[in-house]
């Protein structure tokens, strides 16, 4: 994927969603067609491929049985998006410090399960009785699709290769 320089100080949620959509589309188009530069509506230039025989034909190269396709991403593209921070996804050039747990019981948060606590306000009031959500930080290893913050169904990439190889 190639990208032109963007104003990194003005990254909005829409531009980041568009960036992630571009990454996903590059992975989908990767094995189908010869390279051709195309410009997306938000101004980012990406490299996509034209359909070979049929638009419905799917190439199986790069897809392992029972897993997801591996997507190659140029490191420079992620460097340009470095200032974006998301509470849900971390794009990093560094490998995680530890592998994901093999079983849920290995996860410390599962061992120390806490129920939601009731909040109390002064006086008699019915607002804010329960916490909206509990923060949970753990590895997800078995997801192939998810729902984004706007409620759209998205594909979860199994692996992203960084660099020129």
Swiss-Prot record:
Protein localization: Secreted
GO CC terms, sorted: axon; dendrite; extracellular space; synaptic vesicle
Keywords: Cleavage on pair of basic residues, Glycoprotein, Growth factor, Secreted, Signal
Residues that carry a glycan: 112
Function summary: Seems to promote the survival of visceral and proprioceptive sensory neurons.
PANTHER family noted in UniProt: NERVE GROWTH FACTOR NGF -RELATED, NEUROTROPHIN-3
Name of this protein: Neurotrophin-3
Organism: Aspidites melanocephalus (Black-headed python)
Organism taxonomic ancestry: Eukaryota, Metazoa, Chordata, Craniata, Vertebrata
């Amino acid at each position: 994927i190639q990208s032109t320089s963007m104003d990194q100080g003005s990254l909005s949620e829409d531009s980041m969603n568009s960036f992630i959509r571009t990454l996903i589309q590059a992975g989908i188009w990767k094995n189908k067609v010869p390279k051709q530069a195309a410009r997306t509506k938000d101004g980012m230039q990406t490299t996509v491929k034209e359909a070979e025989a049929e638009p419905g034909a799917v190439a199986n190269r790069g897809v392992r049985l029972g897993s997801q396709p591996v997507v190659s991403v140029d490191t420079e593209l992620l460097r340009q998006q470095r200032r974006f921070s998301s509470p849900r996804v971390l794009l990093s050039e560094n490998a995680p410090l530890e592998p994901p747990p093999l079983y849920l019981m290995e996860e410390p948060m599962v061992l120390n399960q806490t129920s939601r606590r009731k909040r109390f306000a002064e006086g008699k009031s019915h607002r804010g009785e329960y916490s909206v959500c509990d923060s949970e930080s753990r590895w997800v290893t078995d997801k192939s699709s998810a729902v984004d913050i706007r409620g759209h169904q998205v594909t979860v990439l199994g692996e992203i290769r960084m660099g020129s190889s």
